[in-house]
Amino acid sequence: MSRTIAAALAVAALAVGTATAAPAASGLSPTFTTCRDKAQGAVEQAACLTSESARQDQRLNQAYRQLQAKLSGAKKTKLVNAQRAWLQSRSRDGELDTALYDDSQPGNLQGELNDVMRLSARADQLQKYLQLLD
């Protein structure tokens, strides 16, 4: 019984965390927000996160390629080095998420949400750099 209560509390905490965490990255898609709001259960939430992760990864890669095309020499090298460092940081943050959150569905969902937020924040940052160059 206490495991059931703990699981219910974890799902409730995730729902609150998701609702408050999502606006932090401005590039999250309206599709994700709608999907998340309509999701009923962990499987549907996971599907929303998987789709949004793919969207954010595509957005990040597009911004990165556009920046690479606009930069040359030392600036381009700095971009490549910064992106490599970000990828390492993202990986380490994911490892920390895995260590901190349990292996339950809510823990896994929170880890995935955190990664989506990291992707979105990095894509936002790269798009701001593009705006500086325009």
Task: Go through each PLM region and give its residues.
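N-terminal alpha-helical modules
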Residues: S2-T4, T20-D134
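Bacterial N-terminal signal peptides
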Residues: A7-G17
